[in-house]
Amino acid sequence: MRMADSSLDAWTAFALGLADEAGAMLAKAASARPEVEVKPDRSFVTDLDRAIELRLRDRIADRYPDHGVIGEEGGEPVVRDLTWVLDPIDGTAAFIAGMPVYGTLIALMQDDTPILGIIDLPSTSERWVGVAGRPTRHGGRVCATRACASLPEAILSASNPDFFSAEELPALEAMRAATAWRIYGGACRAYGLLASGRTDLAIDTRLKLWDYAPYVPIIEGAGGIVTDWQGRRLSMQSGPQLLAAGDPARHREALALVEKALAA
């Protein structure tokens, strides 16, 4: 079912308000080193992660009680026809270390499809907003991916190589060998920069729904493509692997590289 523009406008305005609130909480706490807990999966969480998510969940429950919510730090996921997906601090390790690549990720899914996505980085005053069927905006202005003539000219971003399992490392190595430059550890900002035409490719693993859902409307609305490593469009059941490109032709080549590397 195609959503009315008025509904998309209302949800987008509401999501921007959520991002404003999360950003204010992050900015207020940025100067102090937070208390850190290591979760069972060895990732980090802080009291601020939980506080931000709880605040956003409360706002959603008040405004849209019939919507579902899935969050990284919250309780049991509630899935409805329309479901909000929250990552209160993407790049928690960077936040703990004071590196300004962390941010809040917000998405709205209609059934299995992300239709709204926000990457908000209060530390750099950057925000990317993607809405299905509309051009992506960075800082309020339309942004677009760039054409890339060949993989040997491409700039690749990737998460920490330590995140890749022994079985996945050949895919990363193949991408590293095929591209001109590599940038690691950019967290959510790396995907915003791809949407703005600053980088060309991104490869990741160990991702959950809240890590990737916002990227779909943001990258697609900027002219790019984002899938799993098999070339399938991302949905609620996807993960943990992601491959994104600003130029669809380079995405096809990268998929072939990854497939060959994993089959060797």
Regions found by a protein language model. Give the residues of each.
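A structural micro-motif at secondary-structure boundaries
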Residues: 138-142
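DPxDG-like acidic metal-binding loop motif
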Residues: 79-137
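N-terminal subdomain of lithium-sensitive/metallo-dependent phosphomonoesterases centered on the IMPase/IPPase/PAP
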Residues: 1-89, 264
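Short secondary-structure boundary/capping segments
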Residues: 35-36, 61, 75-77, 119, ...
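An extended, acidic
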Residues: 145-264
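Residue-level signal for inorganic ion chemistry
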Residues: 22, 26, 49, 60, ...
